[in-house]
Amino acid sequence: MAKQIKYGEEARKALERGVNAVANTVKVTLGPRGRNVVLDKKYGTPTVTNDGVTIAREIELEDPFENQGAQLLKEAATKTNDVAGDGTTTATLLAQVMVLEGLKNLAAGANPMLLRRGMAKAVEAAVEGLRRISKPIDNKESIAHVAAISAADEEIGQLIAEAMEKVGKDGVITVEESKTIGTTLEVVEGMQFDRGYISPYMVTDAEKMEAVLEEPVILITDKKLSSVQDLLPLLEQIVQHGKKLLIIADDVEGEALATLVVNKLRGTFSCVAVKAPGFGDRRKEMLQDIAILTGGQVISEELGYDLKDVTLDMLGRARQVKVTKEHTTIVGGAGNPEDIKKRINQIKAQIEETTSDYDREKLQERLAKLAGGVAVIQVGAATETELKEKKHRIEDALAATKAAVEEGIVPGGGVALLNVIEDVQKVVDSLEGDFKTGAKIVLKALEAPVRQIAENAGVDGSIIVEKIKAAKDPNFGYDAYREEFTDMIKRGIIDPTKVTRTALQNAASIASMILTTEAIVVDVPEKEKSNIPGAGMDMM
């Protein structure tokens, strides 16, 4: 396919136009007085949102050269969202300011490679400064604060704080759409996986259609159970000791299933069988997780165990097991806390090493199930549009809160970036030439968020920036919602350090890329072929 190419100044100008198209659309949403943006949907009602990354993702430009600039800026927003879950608008704004400042300097003859290195040094100093002023988050009240600010709703803040308190910081918190108007929190203690009973005859509560086993023993195997002969020695021990049994196997069918059901109906012993969760290698890992959690062993021929030789001390134990048509929940597994801790650390190490987002998500689910349980926030609203918007806000707030627990918090409203200006100024003073110019680009960008928040609230940004700088108080800032200066930490206007740090690093990374671009190559658009048939008759 033929290509079109633009070089040098012309290429960078096209990128600049693309950057401006995205940034000017996104930055109007920054701060508590930020405006909304309406996104057209081909089907259904338009989406009204003030979430930076949602808006950025929708933007595609007609000009292919300008579109490259737009896509690069979207990368800064998306990457920030993936890592920190928030801060997308800040990242977009910072990147725009750095690109515009950098291009001015390039036009004046600066060397792009030296600018890039100067910017990197300045960002390094700013990140160190952020870590220095960061305050750790450790109590429920401050967690609720962070969540309430991100979601702009105190009730949601409380729900998220409660969820984190119940399942721990490594626990999984999922957000689902509710059938009702209210928003509620449901916490599933222990380990839950998406497999229900194999036969409905196994239920203990016919009204709720669920099976509840108190103090059961748990057989965990990767085998398919079809012959009753394999199970008989174990079942005899179960009856002898009057135990209740949960079987987690690859499958239970035929004569083995019939025997279990008949004995359950006769009241000989209580038993529930479920299929093992997951597939392939992931299934083996999950069975091992369940074994460690319950203090049992995986009965597998790979490990040299035969079902006929299984004794009660090889089975797992739990305080309670609840099985519905779709889920199995194991509460109060009797595993050794040391072994569980080792397994948790092993999964954490795998999360660090993996490069696949899907694998990371699945590993985090496994980690949560071992580390404390699952909390589900059921989101309700009066209309479909409101429901989508509310769910979005809660997901954002959840990610921001997790980031705050991880790396602590800094004063919000863009004040943290103003606070690290002194750290960056020291770097600027120590550099010369184009290195210095590069560091100054970052220095100027650090003022942009406060300026934009003020301007979105209808106030002169420059005056606000100067007043905050003059105060010499690290927590002093402008509350755009109440339109007054205040102590940001006391007022509860805070940002997770991770969000601010990630936004700055990603913005500088994308800006450096654009500034060091010397050519853009895009496809030549295909001319649409005319479908009108030729007039007249063919020659015979």
Swiss-Prot record:
EC assignment: 5.6.1.7
Keyword Cytoplasm: yes
Compartments where found: Cytoplasm
Statement: the UniProt record of this protein carries the keyword Glycoprotein: no
Catalytic activity reported: ATP + H2O + a folded polypeptide = ADP + phosphate + an unfolded polypeptide
One BP term from GO: protein refolding
GO cellular component term of the entry, any: cytoplasm
List of residues binding ATP: 29-32, 86-90, 413, 495
Alphabetized GO MF terms: ATP binding; ATP-dependent protein folding chaperone; isomerase activity; unfolded protein binding
Keywords: ATP-binding, Chaperone, Cytoplasm, Isomerase, Nucleotide-binding
Function: Together with its co-chaperonin GroES, plays an essential role in assisting protein folding. The GroEL-GroES system forms a nano-cage that allows encapsulation of the non-native substrate proteins and provides a physical environment optimized to promote and accelerate protein folding.
Family affiliation: Belongs to the chaperonin (HSP60) family.
Oligomeric form and interacting partners: Forms a cylinder of 14 subunits composed of two heptameric rings stacked back-to-back. Interacts with the co-chaperonin GroES.
HAMAP family: CH60
Name of the protein this chain belongs to: Chaperonin GroEL
Gene responsible for this protein: groEL
